[in-house]
């Protein structure tokens, strides 16, 4: 039987990946043990650099994973043990729109200034009121922060806000130094950022490395490391090589084909762990786009064999899904998790019914090097779509250029992206599909979905709120403004001198990484 084009591509991709990376350091059986690096310095290799030190004006998980070591939240949430105090000592839900907080005393910023409730007010009201900031949509529910004393304050929301604590424990809510920024200005802050975290800024060589040093005045436990270096290494093979030669202690996004090689090298190991990240395609649904036809979107979905990509290209490092809200998140619809649809013959039939019997062209943009096997994945999808008559004009982009176009909502019919969820709540996963938030991106407009999402945003009844999100996910799965591929597992390379368990939310709290 004739093998499909994408099947041949998949076989070739697996063979080539299995042959790559071995020339620099020899075969898996013959690797030399890695050299131990400085015991007081931790080096982590990311695939991308930080995008900004403005914690309100980015929405990139890999950047947040660095920032959590420089800035503190009011509270933390790992998705397993619930909320824990960080800068806040205690909190109380006074009524549906009012939360009271008490700060820990004696906390200092890296420049020696004391943390007070004025800093909290400055931070949260900035992100809540400035609609030009990328994280504004996650905090515009805040009406006011009322300072009651140096260490006491209230947060007043515009409407009931059931997910407020989730928001205050994630990206965008790290507390900023009001006096320092107002005195020196934002330009100075962005060059010399100041937080309250266990590590403080030392040096940044853009697109190369960011170096942090221990904050000896930290209010919590003393930092475990004298220095932490985050290196930006986009190439998979280079990250692996640096891990094997001792140039880095931790390397993210290890290709599945390199796992055996790493595990056969003394002194290092590869660890596979689940994440919150769901890889997906976002499609334009407006009438002016070819993907505005629901039959076309369904055909695209049915033409993609997600399970084959997970099994072969990712070697099992993922779980197919028809929702972005994965188990462990408030509002998850587990009936849609672990499921995928694949029926290329029906896809052809749907395209014929939609008036595209002779096929059509569409634009697809994707990052190259940001996610595990992102380039190879979209190339396979391009081949799969060609099998049903869809010609894809594929644009592969460096992450910084892709991210800029993403912020500008400048993509064509489709783009490929992966979203994490450090809120552990369905609201973060689904808010982009309200009519207002979808405008200019997917242009999705389903009044029933919109009503469900807006109602859930304000519903203080936890059970009813979860049901609203679950129903919305069922409708979204049928409408397909987003086509979900798989929940991605992380494969992390680790020097065996370390104790380190990768987190579900992909954060690098470096003081949880310790020497054995």
Where are these regions (language model features)?
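N-terminal lobe/hinge region of extracytoplasmic solute-binding protein
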Residues: 45-94, 125, 194, 507
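Gly/Pro-rich hinge or "lid" segments in bacterial periplasmic/extracellular proteins
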Residues: 78-82, 169-223, 227
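Surface-exposed binding/hinge segments that line
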Residues: 92, 137-179
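Alpha-helical secondary-structure segments
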Residues: 117-123, 150-154, 197-198, 225-227, ...
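Ligand-site clamp/hinge motif
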Residues: 216-261
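Structural transition elements
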Residues: 319-353, 371-375
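Extracytoplasmic/peripheral linker and loop segments enriched in polar/acidic and small residues
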Residues: 393-402, 428-496
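Long beta-strand-rich cores associated with HINT superfamily self-processing modules
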Residues: 492-516
């Amino acid at each position: 039987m004739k093998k499909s084009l994408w099947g041949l591509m998949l076989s070739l991709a697996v063979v080539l990946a299995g042959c790559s990376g071995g020339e620099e350091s020899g075969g898996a059986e013959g690797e030399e043990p890695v050299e131990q690096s400085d015991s007081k310095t931790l080096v982590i290799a990311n695939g991308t650099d930080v995008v900004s030190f403005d914690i309100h004006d980015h929405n990139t998980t890999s950047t947040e994973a660095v920032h959590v070591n420089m800035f503190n939240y009011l509270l933390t949430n790992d998705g397993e043990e619930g909320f824990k105090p960080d800068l806040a000592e205690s909190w109380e839900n006074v009524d549906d729109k009012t939360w009271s907080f008490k700060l820990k005393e004696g906390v200092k910023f890296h420049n020696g200034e004391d943390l007070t409730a004025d800093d909290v007010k400055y931070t949260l009201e900035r992100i809540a009121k400035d609609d030009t900031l990328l994280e504004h949509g996650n905090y515009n529910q805040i009406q006011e922060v009322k300072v009651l004393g140096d260490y006491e304050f209230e947060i007043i929301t515009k409407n009931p806000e059931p997910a407020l604590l989730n928001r205050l424990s994630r990206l965008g809510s790290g507390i900023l130094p009001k006096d320092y920024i107002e005195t020196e200005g934002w330009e100075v802050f962005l060059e010399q950022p100041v937080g309250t975290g266990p590590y403080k800024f030392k040096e940044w060589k853009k697109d190369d490395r960011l170096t942090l040093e221990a904050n000896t005045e930290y209010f919590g436990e003393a930092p475990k490391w004298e220095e932490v270096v985050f290196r930006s290494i986009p190439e998979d093979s280079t990250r692996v090589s640096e891990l094997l030669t001792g140039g880095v202690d931790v390397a993210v996004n290890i290709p599945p084909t390199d796992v055996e090689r790493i595990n056969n090298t003394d002194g290092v190991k590869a660890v596979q762990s689940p994440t919150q990240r769901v890889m997906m395609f976002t499609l334009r649904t407006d009438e002016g786009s070819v993907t505005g036809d629901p039959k076309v979107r369904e055909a695209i979905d049915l033409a993609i064999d997600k399970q084959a990509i997970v099994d072969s290209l990712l070697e099992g490092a993922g779980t197919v899904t028809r929702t972005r809200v994965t188990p462990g998140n408030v509002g998850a619809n587990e009936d849609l998790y672990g499921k995928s649809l694949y029926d290329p013959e029906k896809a052809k039939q749907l395209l014929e019914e939609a008036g595209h019997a002779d096929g059509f062209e569409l634009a697809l943009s994707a990052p190259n090097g940001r996610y595990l096997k992102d380039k190879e994945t979209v190339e396979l999808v391009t081949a799969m779509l060609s099998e049903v008559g869809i010609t894809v004009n594929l644009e592969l982009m460096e992450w910084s250029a892709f991210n800029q176009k993403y912020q500008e909502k400048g993509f064509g019919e489709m783009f490929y992206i992966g979203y994490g969820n450090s809120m552990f709540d369905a609201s973060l996963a689904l808010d982009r599909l309200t009519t207002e938030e979808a405008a200019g991106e997917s242009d999705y407009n389903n009044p029933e979905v919109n009503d469900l999402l807006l109602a859930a945003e304000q519903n203080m009844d936890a059970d009813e709120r979860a049901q609203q999100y679950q129903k919305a996910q069922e409708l979204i799965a049928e409408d397909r403004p987003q086509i979900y591929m798989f929940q991605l597992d992380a494969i992390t390379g680790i020097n065996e001198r370390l104790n380190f368990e990768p987190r579900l939310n992909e954060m690098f709290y470096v003081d949880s990484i310790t020497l054995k």
